[in-house]
Curated annotation (Swiss-Prot):
One of its GO terms (molecular function) is GTP binding. CDD domains: YihA_EngB. The keyword Nucleotide-binding applies. GO terms for biological process: division septum assembly. Its cofactor is Mg(2+). One of its GO terms (cellular component) is cytosol. The lineage of its organism: Bacteria, Bacillati, Bacillota, Bacilli, Bacillales. Keywords: Cell cycle, Cell division, GTP-binding, Magnesium, Metal-binding, Nucleotide-binding, Septation. Belongs to the TRAFAC class TrmE-Era-EngA-EngB-Septin-like GTPase superfamily. EngB GTPase family. This is Probable GTP-binding protein EngB. Mg(2+) binds at residues 37, 59.
Amino acid sequence: MKVNHAEIVISAVSKKQYPEDQLPEIALAGRSNVGKSSFINRLINRKNLARTSSKPGKTQTLNFYRINESFYFVDVPGYGYAKVSKKEREKWGRMMEEYFQTRDTLRAVVLVTDLRHDPTQDDIQMYDFIKYFDLPVIIIGTKLDKITKNKRQKHINRAKQVLEMDETDLFIPFSAEIGEGKDEAWSALSRYIKR
């Protein structure tokens, strides 16, 4: 997909702040610092629309990015960052649950994981959380460029096994650094962003 226009519309903390234009939405979930912002930036060919940070826990709101005036990427707070207070984590959890449970325009969730490592218990819980709400899920295994080519399939198979992925769910190895997996990601997303 060629992206001609991309902008952040709002950083929301409750549903009364969500955009009201009824465009389809794709949520992006994953651990803190796993590469959700880099994934967005690579897909839209921008360096800094979604701000990246070496400091985990940067995203603390639901960030709505309108793409080509036709759909939204919604970056949700990362999970698994120990230095965030329990109270703050609970607040994020309620905010995300409200979004996943009530948002009619939410079409699918992209779960971003680090392909170099086995999915964490938090990744497994998020996958199960998404499945509980009966939402389509696409797993993106980031940092593909950091794994030697002869070990990639082993890492992919292991991630699928640890997540106990449904056969119908898609797993896409991805590198924000070199763009590998970008076309496959757009292809998978395209079925959910048509009105």
